[in-house]
Amino acid sequence: MYVELVDETGQVPSEIIEQTKEVLAFAAKKLDLKESTEMSVTFVDNARSHELNLQYRETDRPTDVISLEYKPDESEFFFDEDMELPEELLEEMDPFIGELFISIDKAAEQAADYGHSIEREYGWLAVHGFLHINGYDHYTPEEESEMFALQEEILTAYGLTR
């Protein structure tokens, strides 16, 4: 999987950037995503996170991670509006699945609050957002149980334990 990483803050250590790429590639293998899959991750500060959270979620505060899932639109590729294509074909034509915005301020706060390493927190946020992009959610107790168990399984197997 290809992950484009952007550090808008200029403060994220190169080790965290590499770890983020690696843990997302690891998670992609766990979900059996194609190697051609692409996504982006942008590290932002709380001010930018607040702005994005307001824009996309209509929530007036900063947040730790924002996940924007991308679904290819048939109209981008074909002129015949009546033509329906299998989702697999659309995914092959446009392998971009979404983007994450991770707040470095929230990552630092939460690592301290939860008493684990900053590496673990960045990994947690990246995998959490990645799972959202891939259809997982936590609106119900059942969804939360499934998503958080998978998230913990990925992080533990990768080596980011508490």
UniProtKB/Swiss-Prot annotation:
Q: Does the keyword Metal-binding apply?
A: yes
Cofactor: binding details: Binds 1 zinc ion.
**Subcellular locations according to the entry:** Cytoplasm
GO-annotated molecular function: metalloendopeptidase activity; RNA endonuclease activity; zinc ion binding
Task: Give the coiled coil ranges.
Answer: none
Which amino acids does the record list as binding Zn(2+)?
128, 132, 138
Q: Which cofactor does it need?
A: Zn(2+)
Keywords of the record, alphabetical order, are: Cytoplasm, Endonuclease, Hydrolase, Metal-binding, Nuclease, Ribosome biogenesis, rRNA processing, Zinc
Q: Which GO terms describe its cellular component?
A: cytoplasm
- EC numbers listed for it are 3.1.-.-
Q: Which GO terms describe its biological process?
A: rRNA processing
| Entries under Pfam families matching the protein | YbeY (PF02130)
Q: What does this protein do?
A: Single strand-specific metallo-endoribonuclease involved in late-stage 70S ribosome quality control and in maturation of the 3' terminus of the 16S rRNA.
Please state which protein family the record places this protein in.
Answer: Belongs to the endoribonuclease YbeY family.
The protein's name: Endoribonuclease YbeY
Taxonomy, top ranks, is: Bacteria, Bacillati, Bacillota, Bacilli, Lactobacillales
